[in-house]
């Protein structure tokens, strides 16, 4: 059974006109390795920590600025939100299609809230806490191409022609602001698009981004802005002592116009200085150590890296299943070919390397959770090939595992990925959850004052391929754990226990 919304009635939660306040007992464990009767033993001690959460219920008018707004993802997301807002239907060769948000965690998934008369009751994910309605988002952004969004949508060839025709009047007037272009960081084949670029030194470019954000906010009368990178994958930046390893060195390098500061890092610096949440949707190392330190000092949300949309999402599910079932993965071989602009940019070795690194650690935490399998998975080789005729990505994976008594099992997956149709709802979720997390404050027992989440937003890790985490924090890639973490944190904000699936009342 499905219900549209709900309200929690409990001594641990209080709703007011301004906030939701909850008290939550966080049940965890503490491990100690100590001498007991002459031998060292691992002792697990259950531990309860009392937390308080308060969530601002005022939903702001949200502006979303996309870096690479005129790319496939940017034009697809913008058109998709307009189609949903306007209730557009269009004809395909098979049917009359209605706009939807399938693929969005916040807009198209559900959570279990309990049972009623022996039936499981579910509610929309977006009903847990007040969230921005996608229909109300104001879009803007930058692109190194000056093509308007209607023409960019046609160039992307993602939407059906009938839908494009209906969207064109809404999107023709949308033109990206000039973007930062540095040919040293992306493939040379992108140069033909670069007719809309910000001139000047790197610091001047960064200051122009700040000016653009302020003008966008003022022009559109938005309360809050979130910036997200959905532009080309850059090559990895060199992390060098004295260049970008500390806040001071990074800002000094900016003053000196050091060549090794990437465009994505310039956008991120601008956002952090303006206290604007910034999310990196590509695999490069935008968040060099000095930038992470700057975000922490200024308590500005940053998140990334790389959208987890198709092939990698499947991998984070399948390997979790294999390891959890006691099956020993021994080899994962992956191959992609695609013909869109993403594939063309990734055809350059230096940008491909960023994607390779992003994909390389996806299974590490799952394999290391089982002592029998540690260090046994070979996840190479992997290839990404640019095939112009094939617009839609094809992903092929072969998983080889060892099973009972020396047997071998092979699983082969072929995944045809509509990349931008998978990525667009993920972008939507990222900006909505980033905005929501800025309205949540918490404090643990013994802490005097409420504070926000850590600026490095692990709460977004379900949506990213290589989750950015605070220093010293374990990286979790298993999709089910990431989903449970996100849902259970939001449940805690309304005083609900985590969903543990025990269902003891029926045992």
From Swiss-Prot:
Pathway: Polyol metabolism; myo-inositol biosynthesis; myo-inositol from D-glucose 6-phosphate: step 1/2
Membrane-spanning ranges: none
GO aspect biological process, one term: inositol biosynthetic process
Named cofactor requirement(s): NAD(+)
Annotated GO CC locations: cytosol; nucleus
Record's keyword annotation contains Lipid biosynthesis: yes
EC number: 5.5.1.4
Keywords: Cytoplasm, Inositol biosynthesis, Isomerase, Lipid biosynthesis, Lipid metabolism, NAD, Nucleus, Phospholipid biosynthesis, Phospholipid metabolism
Reaction equations catalysed: D-glucose 6-phosphate = 1D-myo-inositol 3-phosphate
Chief location of this protein within or outside the cell: cytoplasm
UniProt KW Nucleotide-binding keyword: no
Alphabetized Pfam families for the sequence: Inos-1-P_synth, NAD_binding_5
Cellular location(s): Cytoplasm, Cytosol; Nucleus
Function: Key enzyme in myo-inositol biosynthesis pathway that catalyzes the conversion of glucose 6-phosphate to 1-myo-inositol 1-phosphate in a NAD-dependent manner.
Similarity section: Belongs to the myo-inositol 1-phosphate synthase family.
Protein name as catalogued: Inositol-3-phosphate synthase
Species of the source: Citrus paradisi
């Amino acid at each position: 059974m499905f219900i549209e919304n709900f309200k929690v009635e409990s001594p641990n939660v209080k709703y007011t006109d301004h906030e939701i306040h909850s008290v939550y007992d966080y049940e965890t464990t503490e491990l100690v390795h100590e001498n007991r009767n002459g031998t060292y033993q691992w002792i697990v001690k259950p531990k309860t920590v009392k937390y308080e959460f308060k969530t601002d219920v005022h939903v702001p008018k949200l502006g979303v600025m996309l870096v690479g707004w005129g790319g496939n993802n940017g034009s697809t997301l913008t058109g998709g939100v307009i189609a949903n807002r306007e209730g557009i239907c269009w004809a395909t060769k098979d049917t009359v299609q209605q706009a939807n948000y399938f693929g969005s965690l916040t807009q198209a998934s559900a959570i279990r809230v309990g049972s009623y008369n022996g039936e499981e009751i579910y509610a929309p994910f977006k009903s847990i806490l007040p969230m921005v309605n996608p229909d109300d988002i104001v879009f803007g952004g930058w692109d190194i191409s000056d093509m308007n969004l209607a023409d960019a949508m046609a160039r992307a060839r993602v939407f059906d022609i009938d839908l494009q025709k209906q969207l064109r009047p809404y999107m023709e007037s949308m033109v990206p602001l000039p973007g930062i272009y540095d040919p040293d960081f992306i493939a040379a084949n992108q140069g033909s698009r670069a007719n809309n670029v910000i001139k000047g030194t790197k610091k001047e470019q960064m200051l122009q981004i700040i000016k653009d954000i302020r003008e966008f906010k003022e022009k559109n009368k938005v309360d809050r802005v979130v910036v997200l990178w959905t532009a080309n994958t850059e090559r990895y930046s060199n992390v060098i002592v004295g260049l970008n390893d500390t806040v001071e060195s990074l800002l000094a390098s900016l003053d000196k116009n050091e060549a090794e500061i990437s465009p994505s890092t310039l956008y991120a610096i601008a956002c952090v200085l303006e206290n604007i949440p910034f999310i990196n949707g590509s695999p490069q190392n935008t968040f060099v150590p000095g930038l992470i330190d700057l975000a922490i000092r200024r308590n500005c949300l940053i998140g990334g890296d790389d959208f987890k949309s198709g092939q990698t999402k499947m991998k984070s599910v399948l390997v979790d299943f294999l390891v959890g079932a006691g099956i020993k993965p021994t080899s994962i071989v992956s191959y992609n070919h695609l013909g869109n602009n993403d594939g063309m940019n990734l055809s350059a070795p230096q940008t491909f390397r960023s994607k390779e690194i992003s994909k390389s650690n996806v299974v590490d935490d799952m394999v290391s959770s089982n002592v029998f399998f540690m260090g046994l998975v070979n996840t190479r080789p992997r290839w990404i090939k640019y095939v112009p005729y094939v617009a839609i990505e094809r992903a092929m994976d072969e998983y080889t595992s060892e099973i009972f008594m020396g047997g071998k099992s092979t699983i082969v997956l072929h995944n045809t990925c509509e990349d931008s149709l998978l990525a667009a709802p993920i972008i939507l979720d990222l900006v909505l959850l980033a905005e929501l997390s800025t309205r949540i404050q918490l404090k643990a027992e013994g802490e005097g004052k409420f504070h926000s989440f850590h600026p490095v937003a692990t709460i977004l890790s379900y949506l990213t391929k290589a989750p950015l985490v605070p220093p010293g924090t374990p990286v979790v890639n298993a999709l089910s754990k990431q989903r449970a973490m996100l849902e259970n944190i939001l449940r805690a904000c309304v005083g609900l226990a985590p969903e543990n699936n025990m269902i003891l009342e029926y045992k």
